[in-house]
């Protein structure tokens, strides 16, 4: 998707390309920020003629880790199957894969998430902090899982998108 957008946008205008994903999609967008230098498509005959690095990454209540202590079991099974190796577990545990040039991250989760353990986000935050990656981490006490961009669900998480918009402005991604 990043390649398609970058190769087909109006080059006379400045474009900012961010990626946002929720739950398992949060894992996917974090991978896009971490693995953008890897040309996984070349073996399929698809050649890259642009940067695959997103300008920013927004994982919301994300799956982060494939490690036994944190893994969302269904996500791990869907991604790795049932006969996975330790190397695969480590490769797809994003808290272990953050590069020094990771794009800025806006990370959101709630402690009462009944689907994805919030400690996934805590571990990602620790790694981003350790590597001095520009990021914001919103950790809410309540909000559950699946609140998306909704302001209708109420509670603390209802206004995360307003904080996100402010972050976009402060980081010069939008005016």
Per-region residue spans from a language model:
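Stable alpha-helical elements in mature extracytoplasmic
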Residues: 1, 24-28, 94, 120, ...
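Primarily recognizes the serine-hydrolase "nucleophile elbow" in alpha/beta-hydrolase
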Residues: 1-71, 89
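Hydrophobic anchor at the start of a short beta-strand
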Residues: 17, 105, 135
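A general structural signal for stabilizing positions within well-ordered secondary structure
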Residues: 48, 96-97, 129
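Mobile cap/lid helix-loop segments that gate and shape the active-site cleft of serine hydrolases
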Residues: 62-97, 103
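Acidic catalytic loop of the alpha/beta-hydrolase fold
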Residues: 66, 112-116
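Short beta-strand/loop motif that positions the catalytic acidic residue
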Residues: 101, 106-109, 113
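C-terminal catalytic histidine-bearing segment of alpha/beta-hydrolase fold enzymes
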Residues: 108, 118-175
């Amino acid at each position: 998707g990043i390649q398609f957008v970058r190769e087909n946008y109006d080059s006379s205008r400045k474009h900012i390309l961010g990626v946002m994903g929720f739950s398992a999609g949060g894992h996917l967008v974090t991978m896009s920020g971490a693995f953008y230098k890897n040309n996984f498509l070349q073996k399929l005959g698809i050649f890259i003629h642009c940067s695959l690095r997103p300008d920013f990454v927004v994982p919301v209540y994300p799956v982060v880790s494939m490690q036994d202590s944190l893994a969302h079991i269904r996500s791990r099974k869907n991604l790795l199957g049932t006969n996975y190796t330790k190397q695969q577990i480590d490769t797809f545990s994003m808290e272990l894969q953050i590069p020094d040039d990771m794009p800025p991250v806006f990370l959101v989760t709630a402690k009462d998430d009944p689907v994805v353990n919030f400690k996934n986000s805590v571990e990602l935050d620790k790694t981003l902090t350790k590597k001095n990656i520009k990021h914001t981490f919103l950790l809410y006490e309540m909000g559950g899982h699946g609140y998306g961009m909704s302001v209708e669900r109420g509670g603390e998480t209802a206004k995360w998108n307003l904080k996100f918009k402010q972050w976009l402005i402060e980081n010069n991604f939008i005016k």
